[in-house]
Curated annotation (Swiss-Prot):
Coiled-coil ranges (or none): none
InterPro entries according to UniProt: Crypto/Photolyase_FAD-like_sf, Crypto/Photolyase_N_sf, Cryptochrome/DNA_photolyase_1, DNA_photolyase_N, Rossmann-like_a/b/a_fold
Residue ranges of every copy of the Photolyase/cryptochrome alpha/beta domain listed in the record: 4-133
One GO BP annotation of this record: response to light stimulus
Pfam family name, one: DNA_photolyase
Signal peptide: none
Disulfide bonds, paired cysteine numbers: none
Protein species of origin: Synechococcus sp. (strain PCC 6716)
Protein name: Uncharacterized 31.6 kDa protein in atpI 5'region
GO molecular-function terms, A-Z: deoxyribodipyrimidine photo-lyase activity; DNA binding; FAD binding
Length: 284
């Protein structure tokens, strides 16, 4: 039996678990192909260092292996995504492309162009929010404007119900009529960077989950004080994982709520609340 093929375009969501768009794509069809596009416009940014690219490549390697373990595949391409994503969708005869919304102006314009091109080709587009616990439109003043002061933002944001993490998608159906050539993962040198050092933080979904588990069982209870001392292991060390989306924000929030339930003192609960406010700050 053949199934329609859907693409899931990975960007800042390099994971299988707690991935809303990927889970939704798998509900539509068992034949889902992941795709990641190395965008020169982003790789050439002034804030892009070799270590950042090395971490990204490590995350992609882990994601590729996770897809393979579930019978699927992750396709990696390079070029302007405004052209490349529609080309990949057309080549694979995809009937739909899924991705997550972004807040950055460049990403929003890029996505608008890609969506328009896909619509012209008769390919469905499915988009939803994933990187935030609440989309920007959900947290506004009584006048319907974004908050400019954090305290009332936090008060409103924290009162909203938080969605639970979604499970990893079921195994993918093996491809039948469509053959996808294996594209090797490029090195940092291939992408124009030189890096021969070791990463301080291990890349990938499994490593991020392990780091979250360790933090939420230990340092989170003293975070309010220990975060002020750089020489102490008092922080979560999850910033890179959240930036590249190798761990879902709903998973992170759920871990903090579980820690609250196990807190044995007011000081511990206050520390956890302080960390939760840092998570809210990401969305302010």
């Amino acid at each position: 039996m053949s199934y329609p093929l859907h693409l899931f375009w990975h960007r800042r969501d390099l994971r299988l678990a707690d991935n809303l768009g990927l889970y939704a794509a798998r509900q539509h069809t068992p034949t889902v192909v992941g795709v990641f596009c190395f965008d020169p416009a982003l790789l050439q940014g002034q804030d892009v260092a070799a270590v950042r690219v090395a971490y990204l490549l490590g995350c992609l390697q882990a994601l590729k292996e996770a897809y393979q373990q579930r019978g699927g595949c992750l396709l990696m391409v390079q070029g302007d995504p405004r052209q490349v994503i529609p080309e990949v969708a057309t080549t694979l005869k995809a009937t739909a492309v899924h991705w997550h919304e972004d807040v950055e102006p460049y990403a929003r314009e890029r996505d608008r162009v890609v969506a328009a091109t896909l619509n012209d080709l008769g390919i469905a587009v499915h988009r939803q929010w994933d990187q935030l616990l609440h989309p920007p439109s959900a947290v506004q003043t009584q006048q319907g404007q974004p908050y400019t002061v954090y305290t009332p933002f936090w008060r409103n944001w924290s009162a909203l119900p938080k969605a639970a993490p979604v499970p990893p998608p079921p195994d993918f159906a093996p491809l039948e009529a469509t053959e996808i050539a294996s594209i090797p993962l490029p090195s940092t040198h291939d992408l124009g960077f030189d890096w021969s050092g070791e990463l301080i933080l291990a890349p990938g979904e499994a490593a991020a989950a392990q780091q979250l588990a360790h933090f939420s069982q230990h340092a989170i209870y003293e975070y309010g004080e220990q975060r002020n001392y750089p020489g102490r292991p008092g922080t979560a060390l999850l910033s890179p994982a959240l930036k590249f989306g190798v761990i879902g924000i709903r998973t992170v929030w759920a871990a903090s709520e579980a820690a609250l339930e196990h807190a044995r003192s007011d000081e511990a609960r206050a520390s956890i609340r302080t960390w939760q406010q840092e998570l809210a700050w990401r969305e302010f």
